[in-house]
Amino acid sequence: MRVILLLLTLDVLGVSSMMTDKNLKKKIEGNWRTVYLAASSVEKINEGSPLRTYFRRIECGKRCNRINLYFYIKKGAKCQQFKIVGRRSQDVYYAKYEGSTAFMLKTVNEKILLFDYFNRNRRNDVTRVAGVLAKGRQLTKDEMTEYMNFVEEMGIEDENVQRVMDTDTCPNKIRIR
């Protein structure tokens, strides 16, 4: 039932329209950097928290039914690389990371990608996260407005938005396995 509500909500918000695009692979595959994150529970994205992800790369198969996400998490001053595999069912990807995660992607333009996910941890706590990935280090004013509107549509408070790019000291390169 929750998945159906999630799909309906995201469809109404226009997020799912990107998922059926024929050029999906071209739009999302490549090197990306996390610029901002926002969460329903802001402590889940604070420095050192497992949902504070420093993205590096997204890869997907022919129709993007399977997607590989490469990112770092910082534990103290140390960066740990992760690769998670999302499998698509309808317009939502499902993956195992810090419990179970359901996520969606939305392109803004060739340089900006929005994402939204629900994470249910091992204690059954649910956190909603909305982020923006970019090819560069800054967003234009219009891109920032688009992201803040996205955060609001996802039901996350403005004060829970954090610029994570400034704390990203992890390596630029990743090991693709």
UniProtKB/Swiss-Prot annotation:
This is Probasin. It is found in: Nucleus; Secreted. InterPro entries: Calycin, Lipocalin, Lipocalin_CS, Lipocln_cytosolic_FA-bd_dom, OBP-like. Residues 1-17 form the signal peptide. Disulfide bonds join 79-170. Induction: Androgen-regulated, increases in concentration with zinc uptake. Belongs to the calycin superfamily. Lipocalin family. Keywords: Disulfide bond, Nucleus, Secreted, Signal. It comes from the Eukaryota. It comes from Rattus norvegicus.
